[in-house]
Amino acid sequence: MFNVVKKTFAYGDHQVTIETGEVARQAGGAVLVSMEETVVLVTVVAAKNAKPGQDFFPLTVDYQEKTYAAGRIPGGFFKREGRPSEKETLTCRLIDRPIRPLFPDGFYNEVQVIATVMSLNPEIDSDIPALIGASAALAISGVPFNGPIGAARVGYIDGQYVLCPTLSQLKGSQLDLVVAGTEAAVLMVESEADQLSEEVMLGAVVFGHTEMQKAINAINELVEEAGKPEWEWEAAPKDEALVASLSALVSAKLEEAYNITVKQTRSQAVKAIRAEAVAALCTGAEGAPDENTVGNLFHEIEASIVRGRILSGAPRIDGRDTRTVRPITMRSGVLPRTHGSALFTRGETQALAVATLGTNRDEQIIDALAGEYRDRFMLHYNMPPYATGECGRVGTPKRREIGHGRLAKRALLAVLPKPEDFSYSMRLVSEITESNGSSSMASVCGGCLALLDAGVPLKAHVAGIAMGLIKDGNRFAVLTDILGDEDHLGDMDFKVAGSTTGITALQMDIKIQGITKEIMQVALAQAKEARIHILNLMQESAAGPREEMSAYAPRLYTFKINPEKIRDVIGKGGAVIRALTEETGTTIDIQDDGTITIAATSGEAAAAARSRIDAITAEVEIGKIYEGTVLKILDFGAIVSVLPGKDGLLHISQIAQERVNKVEDYVKEGQIVRVKVLETDDRGRVKLSMKAAAADEGTVAQPVAAPEAAVQQQQ
């Protein structure tokens, strides 16, 4: 019934098994990938024909984590998996980026890749098995695909590269790098690092690419035994006569349009040329081309002009050479009521970054499949439609915004202070107010400045730069600080962020079928030159963290109490701590070990809260005189409160030197009396004495004539 084919190979310290033929047999391609009890099912389904009028490649990648994979039941009312988590969204992008450029030009059939995590070993991240599975499922499906690809995670521990480290190993690693590529070349890199050199980063990419050949070989063997026949698909032949007509109509005008350096003006000119060409050629007559065909050919001519000029050594679209960074301006403290803010502008790309400080109560609690954890640093990237002069939907963040925010966060993580040195939680929001290339790297620069403006003691300044590539045969040009058009019409988007010491984040996406080590070396060297230039400007603008925090930022005051006193501070049903926070205007956090953190915008409020907590947690001292309140009258004495939550017995024999017949003759409920602590027994009961306190202070206890009368009088 089942024709099961399995391939197993060693991958670092792990065994990886790729299996097909038993599960999801009606899909175009389906594989189960297992790595040390982490199991991912990946399926591929492709439409046999493109939809009429389709002019783009509709590839969809879905990655979903099932809670049963970790032996858990989902929370919430419905007890089902809900909207994708950030991890799921980022993994979708991780799979999409290396496989998309391997589909042939002109292939517009709908393709859907679904990766489902079915079993999870908390030590083994499911993203690498999902990537390998996507490659294998596509390879055996017969869909036109120039793969397979391999994928590997690389760590850097004690000066050695580690293939596919576990999550425990990653905690001690200076590098977390994911690389994907074909047998011949690298297609995608995603990483965060602890200020590592360009040489170490390049070595990690090469190491990962070398090791992933094991996965590629296993997939090739799987295809030989279980692969479906390749589709008989060919790209539609080009209409050379139409190409010639369109080129004659638009080439000279496009050459002129790409001499315009202002983005909006240039875009309008290009749109007008395109509209003119469509009107001239798409007449509706028999045999006339449709708008999609003309539009695709127009894009090719556009790309040919821009790319040809750069490769010939002519100036770029905005007049720069290949190594020059656009003009940069930056300003900190731009928003008066925020904790920290900065406006970073590079050419026609602008980011307004805002930093907010909070307590550990404000940390994000992430309910991950591998287990719940807290995140003290959040970075959110927003790019509204006005940033590109367009109208559009405003709402929940799209995959692109989540991905860009994660990249900027990776860039800054390495320079954040340790929690013990800076106990605040931090939220950074990057509002992209203008966009013409590399807005994520503008978020890194602006975010660094905003954190410094908020008083965060960063270990170093961090800047980011986006590099591009134009490649034609053996000729290539690496571009520094690419524009949006250069990204759109080029072959690579290579983002590098770091400090003067080294790289903290690196992301590379290739639109052609891979690049070589030589090109990566040139790109990294050029990126370092640009990064140092930007860092110098940033250090001139903000040499270090602001000494005095914003008046609106919370001040944190931390101290410890006896853990046994925690319940006294919290009170029954939280009544005590709730009253404390409301009456002092502070936020109070208590840890299980007795560490208390008071967050307040003024020192006076924090001091008031500290004083009240000290009073609640104070221990009664034997021999000390206290001013207490009479809580209750008894036949044999009175109950007196000497500290919050600390009551003692004032026995009738300890009220006055003379004999006391009735307690009410000397004390009344609610009155303030001075008492001395005589002793406490092993059960914590406190014995008090008015007459001992009076003797020590030279006073005498007198009977009261009325409730308002003084209990004690000076001799």
Swiss-Prot record:
It catalyses: RNA(n+1) + phosphate = RNA(n) + a ribonucleoside 5'-diphosphate. One of its GO terms (molecular function) is 3'-5'-RNA exonuclease activity. Mg(2+) binds at residues 487, 493. The gene is pnp. Its EC number is 2.7.7.8. The lineage of its organism: Bacteria, Pseudomonadati, Pseudomonadota, Betaproteobacteria, Rhodocyclales. Residues 623-691 form the S1 motif domain. This is Polyribonucleotide nucleotidyltransferase. Keywords: Cytoplasm, Magnesium, Metal-binding, Nucleotidyltransferase, RNA-binding, Transferase. Involved in mRNA degradation. Catalyzes the phosphorolysis of single-stranded polyribonucleotides processively in the 3'- to 5'-direction. Its cofactor is Mg(2+). Residues 554-613 form the KH domain. InterPro entries: ExoRNase_PH_dom1, ExoRNase_PH_dom2, ExoRNase_PH_dom2_sf, KH_dom, KH_dom_type_1, KH_dom_type_1_sf, NA-bd_OB-fold, PNPase. GO terms for biological process: mRNA catabolic process; RNA processing. GO terms for cellular component: cytosol. PROSITE patterns: KH_TYPE_1, S1.
